[in-house]
Curated annotation (Swiss-Prot):
Keywords: Disulfide bond, Glycoprotein, Glycosidase, Hydrolase, Signal
Pfam entry (one): Glyco_hydro_1
GO biological process per UniProt: carbohydrate metabolic process
Catalytic site: 197 (proton donor), 413 (nucleophile)
Disulfide bonds: 216-224
Protein name: Beta-glucosidase 29
Listed EC numbers: 3.2.1.21
InterPro entries for the chain: Glyco_hydro_1 (IPR001360), Glyco_hydro_1_N_CS (IPR033132), Glycoside_hydrolase_SF (IPR017853)
Organism whose genome encodes this protein: Arabidopsis thaliana
Catalytic activity of the protein: Hydrolysis of terminal, non-reducing beta-D-glucosyl residues with release of beta-D-glucose
Secretion signal span: 1-21
Glycan-linked positions: 255, 331, 371, 522, 553
Recorded GO MF terms: beta-glucosidase activity
């Protein structure tokens, strides 16, 4: 027994440096590190990818109008063709399948389904058929469709008729659009998103005017033809929230949707840190800013009202919900979708021009990419506009958990861009090691949020499947895992991140049967395996044959059954070695 103890201690002393030298968590995470039902996916949106803007009965959207009427505001580019997903979706689905993802998130073009925006004017059968074919093709390839109803592209006809989301009429039109979607696709789609990023729609479209519909106060942005940055962002968000609630009502009342189907809203928070970490004023600015990033659109869909800090700072410019509207909003999201990219530093604004109120200054702070110590929010330089700050995602997830009693959360977008002004070679852009690092680091934070913090996170979607039309940046901002050659027939090329994700998401091959030869595992083969495993240590002076013979002839060790022998013979790495020797320890009675 003393000899056996000595041998065991010798083995453990040899294994200890091997165990402590294992790679860090970010390098060893893979699909199996996450819960079994965790969903991995990728995403696109209709306007950014489909193209075929005048085909199949589709009418112009607000982005068609914006990019054609004000081309200087979209980098002199438009999405008339985009990446031609409308015609190439079958080939693109093969690319999705090769990634080993579980789900694919896409949006339905309201203008393709109901060209006038109003159901009374008719539903476009070609549009219905396109999305049915897309959904069927995804399912046939083992990919779950995840559908977004509104990704910023309502029909221009509604803008011309009554001002789009500035007018409450749009709530019923959106309700009807949603019902058409549920009736036609609800029997095959389990996961639905109502509104994608209401914050961006409201602020970029109506406070800064940099995105469609391009409205703002003239003194904010001289390119804006009309608008009021003091009130329109709040009005638009109000109607977006009520449109969300109306769609959820239709979803829950529709007998054609799957019983286990889920519907929710998707927000786009940037985590905030103080510009000056020693300044109490900047810390208080963060406390005012986070409710805008997170609570502005979550409080209503969970509690039925806006956060108190917004009521305090915006006053009567913030619309109020009626009791009936509040009731409709409460618990109207089965899950919370989070699109996360990075963080901002937040500085207190001590002086505000009260004669020129606007959303960006109502809460007395401004956002910055560099803090007082001249540190950026994360790695980025001239590579692109997104800086990597993965810890912010974990903080966002914990904020939601703590504030809203740990609801179900899906990370619906996470990604990083590569700026391309046309001078970079394809080969340069294909080597996107920064993107691999970005996703490794963010997945590590998601994993920590689940395992260490107890956040109920159920999925992670990469933005985006391929390079596409990136709104005001045109085609210069490349977020895709697949490179699209916009100069040569839109050919797709996998970036290095594609191969990384394939490996990360690969599943072990399960073999249903073993041959008789594979079941036979004799003593000599055991000795060979152990010899290979242990001989990697030059300092291991003890004869492996002696250890094996001692173990083999030990009075207290019984012959293992076939399954245990297969396990014994199969170990190939240090983790397997450790498992074997722990078995040995138990068998010796220690």
């Amino acid at each position: 027994m003393n000899v056996q103890i000595f041998i065991l201690l010798l083995i453990i002393s040899w294994l200890t440096p091997k165990i402590t030298s294992l790679p860090p968590e970010s390098q060893v995470l893979d699909r199996s590190s996450f819960p079994d039902d965790f969903v991995f996916g990728t995403a696109i949106s209709a306007f950014q990818s489909e193209g075929a803007t005048s085909e199949g009965g589709k009418s112009p959207t607000i982005w068609d109008y914006f990019s054609h009427t004000f081309p200087e505001r979209t980098n002199m580019q438009n999405a008339d063709v985009a990446v031609d997903f409308y015609h190439r979706y079958k080939d693109d689905i093969k690319l999705i399948e090769e990634l080993n993802v579980d789900a694919f998130r896409f949006s339905i073009s309201w203008a393709r389904l109901i060209p006038s925006g109003k159901v009374k004017d008719g539903v476009n059968k070609e549009g219905v058929q396109f999305y049915k074919a897309l959904i069927d093709e995804l399912i046939a390839n083992g990919i779950q469709p995840s559908v977004t109803l509104y990704h910023w592209d309502h029909p221009q006809a509604l803008e011309d008729e009554y001002g789009g989301f500035l007018n409450p009429q749009i709530i019923e039109d959106f309700r009807n659009f949603a019902r058409v979607c549920f009736e036609n696709f609800g029997d095959k789609v389990k996961m639905w998103t109502t509104i994608n990023e209401p914050y961006v729609i409201s602020v970029a479209g109506y406070d800064t005017g940099i995105k469609a519909v391009g409205r703002c106060s003239k003194w904010v942005n001289s390119r804006c033809q009309a608008g009021d940055s003091a009130i329109e962002p709040y009005i638009v968000s109000h109607h977006l929230l009520l449109s969300h609630a109306a769609a959820v009502q239709e979803f829950r009342n529709c007998n054609k949707t799957l019983q286990d189907g889920k519907i929710g809203i998707v927000i786009s928070p940037w985590w905030l840190e103080p510009y000056d970490s020693t300044s109490s004023a900047d810390k208080e600015a963060v406390e005012r800013g986070l409710p805008l990033e997170l609570e502005w659109h979550l409080n209503p869909v969970i509690y039925g009202d806006y956060p108190e800090t917004m009521k305090k700072h915006v006053g009567n410019r913030l619309p109020a919900f009626t009791p009936e509207q509040s009731k409709m909003l409460i618990n109207s999201s089965d899950f919370i979708g989070v699109n996360y990219y990075s963080i901002h530093f937040t500085a207190h604004l001590p002086h505000i021009d009260h004669t020129r109120p606007r959303f960006r200054t109502d809460h007395h702070f401004e956002k910055k990419l560099i803090n007082r110590s001249n540190h950026e929010t994360g790695p980025g330089d001239d590579r692109g506009k997104i800086h990597s700050h993965p810890e912010g995602l974990r903080r966002v997830l914990n904020y939601i958990k703590d504030k809203y009693n740990n609801p179900i959360v899906y990370v619906k977008e996470n990604g990083i861009d590569h700026y391309d002004d046309g001078t970079k070679s394809r080969e340069t852009i294909l080597k996107d090691t920064f993107r691999i690092s970005y996703h490794q680091d963010h997945l590590k934070q998601v994993h920590k949020a689940i395992i260490e913090d107890g956040c109920d996170v159920r999925g992670y979607y990469v933005w985006s499947l391929f390079d596409n039309f990136e709104w005001e940046h045109g085609y210069n901002s490349r977020f895709g895992m697949y490179y699209v050659d916009f100069k040569n027939n839109l050919q797709r090329y996998p970036k290095d991140s594609v191969n990384w994700f394939k490996k990360f998401l690969s599943r072990p091959v399960v073999r249903s049967e073993e041959t008789e030869d594979e079941k036979v595992c004799n003593v000599s083969r055991k000795e060979e395996k152990i010899n290979k495993a242990l001989d990697v240590s030059e300092g291991f002076k003890t004869s492996v044959d002696s250890i094996v013979n001692l173990i083999k002839n030990g009075s207290r060790i019984e012959e293992e059954d076939d399954e245990e022998e297969r396990d014994f013979c199969a170990f190939k790495n240090h983790n397997d070695q450790l498992g074997f020797f722990l078995k040995l320890q138990n068998s010796l009675g220690f």
